[in-house]
Amino acid sequence: MEDIAAKTTSKTKGIVVINPNNPTGAVYKRKVLEDIAEHAKQHNMLIFADEIYSKILYDDAEHIPMGSIAKDQLCITFNGLSKAYRLAGFRSGWMILSGNKLDAKDYIEGLDILSSMRLCCNVPAQHAIQTALGGYQSINELILPGGRLLEQRDIAWKMLNDIPGVSCTKPAGAIYMFPRLDPEIYPVKDDEQLVLDL
C-alpha cells in the first residue's frame, strides 16, 4: 500500500486491481483489498476490478470480489468467459457496476451511450454466459489435484526455481509466473536488453 499511496496524486482518478493477478499469480487477501478500497475512498477514485481469473485458484486460495468490499466507491468489475471457461474466441464478457453509483451518473450515462452506439455483443455468446455461469464448473477438473493447470503450475514453478539464480513465488491463482533473476548471476540492465540477449 505504501507504493500505491506514494504514486497517488491529485490527478489520479482510479485504481486497477487485477485479482488473481496478471502477471504474478497472486491472490489478494481481504485486508489488502480493504486497504485499497479505503485508499480509493479517501482519494475519491474509481475502482476497476479485473477478475477474469477469479475461478482459477490453487491450493485453497480464496478469491474475494472487490465489489463485495468497495461499498462506498464506484467499483467496476470485469469478467468473462475467456479464461475459466476457455472460450477466448467467443469474445464474451461483462462488467458490473457496484458501490456508490450516485456520484457517477455522468460516467454511467456515458457507458450507456457508448454501449448503444459503438458496441455490438456477440449474441450467441451472450446466451452461453448464462449456461456457463449456471452450469457445471469444469474449471474445477483443471485446478484441483490431478488437474492439468495445477500440475503445469507445479512443474513450471519447480523448473524455474531449479535454474541457478532464478526464483519464483508459487502462484495462488491465474495462469502466470513472475520469476526474479538474481542480479549477481544475471547482470541485466533492462528488459529490452534481456530479450535481445536471449
Question: What are the language-model segments listed below?
Answer:
Residues 1-198:
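PLP-dependent class I/II
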